[in-house]
Amino acid sequence: MRNLCFVFIFISLLAHGSTHGPDSCNHDRGLCRVGNCNPGEYLAKYCFEPVILCCKPLSPTPTKT
């Protein structure tokens, strides 16, 4: 019974809201953070809604050419 409850909670977390997962956040130059974004970052989307946020820097990072 405990395993069934764990599976139910896991499935409900995966299906909740418009979550994108850490791969999508990292691909877009963001970082998944728990709670709040750091100063100089903004909330772009959720890695796992509503707890884990996808935070991106306010200014774009320069790229080397």
Swiss-Prot record:
A GO cellular-component term linked to this record: extracellular region
Keywords associated with the record: Antibiotic, Antimicrobial, Defensin, Disulfide bond, Secreted, Signal
GO biological processes: defense response to bacterium
Transmembrane helix recorded as keyword: no
Subcellular location, principal: secreted
Induction section of the entry: Induced in the theca layer of the F3 stage ovarian follicle by intravenous injection of LPS. Repressed in the granulosa layer of the F3 stage ovarian follicle by intravenous injection of LPS.
Annotated localization: Secreted; Cytoplasmic granule
Highest taxon in the source lineage: Eukaryota
Disulfide bonds listed in the record: C25-C54, C32-C47, C37-C55
Signal peptide (from-to): 1-19
Tissue specificity annotation: Expressed in the large intestine, kidney liver, gall bladder, testis, ovary and male and female reproductive tracts. Expressed in the ovarian stroma and the theca and granulosa layers of the ovarian follicle.
Similarity comment: family membership: Belongs to the beta-defensin family.
Physiological role: Has bactericidal activity.
Protein name (record): Gallinacin-12
Organism this protein belongs to: Gallus gallus
Lineage of origin: Eukaryota, Metazoa, Chordata, Craniata, Vertebrata
